[in-house]
């Protein structure tokens, strides 16, 4: 086995995870080849690049893991942007979770991390929201990455 072979890696799957792994190996002087069937089929492309630890209603250790991960993202994105000279479109825009009644809102696992929105506030945040949604939580710490950039 040659030194070049030892420092080569093949990654199957060009979604968020595959490309993230490829990036990290590349930064560590590995020769990387990514095989991807169809970028538009990847989960990250479909999920709209959401960074929604709180809006997803995660609990316990998974919530803690999500919060820690989300805190690392801005620094990681900055390194990607510096290395590639391409903006990733990180937006701390917040994510709204609507509720039909206040009881469901108060039982939401990450309720205490959100800003309460009454019906009027909810309509202001999401213009044209169906009137069946009476309450909402705005998770200002959540956001998204523009994952459809090329």
Label each PLM-derived region with a short phrase:
Residues 50-126:
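Dinucleotide-binding Rossmann-like beta1-alpha1 core, especially the glycine-rich loop
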Residues 128-135:
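Short, basic/glycine-rich phosphate-binding loops at helix/coil junctions
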Residues 2-17, 33:
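Beta1/beta-strand and adjacent pyrophosphate-binding region of the FAD-binding site
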Residues 26-46:
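Glycine-rich FAD pyrophosphate-binding loop
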């Amino acid at each position: 086995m040659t030194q070049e072979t030892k420092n080569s890696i093949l990654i199957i799957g060009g979604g968020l995870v595959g490309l993230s792994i490829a990036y990290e190996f590349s930064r560590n002087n590995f020769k990387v080849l990514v095989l991807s069937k169809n970028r538009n089929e990847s989960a990250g492309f479909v999920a709209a690049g959401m960074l929604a630890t709180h809006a997803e209603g995660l609990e316990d250790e998974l919530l803690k893991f999500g919060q820690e991960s989300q805190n690392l993202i801005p620094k990681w994105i900055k390194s990607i942007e510096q290395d590639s000279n391409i903006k990733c479109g990180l937006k701390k825009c917040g994510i709204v979770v609507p509720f039909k009644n206040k009881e469901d809102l108060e039982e939401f696992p990450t309720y205490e991390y959100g800003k309460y929105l009454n019906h009027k506030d909810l309509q202001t945040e999401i213009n044209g929201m169906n009137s069946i949604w009476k309450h909402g939580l705005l998770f200002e710490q959540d956001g998204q990455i523009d994952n459809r950039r090329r």
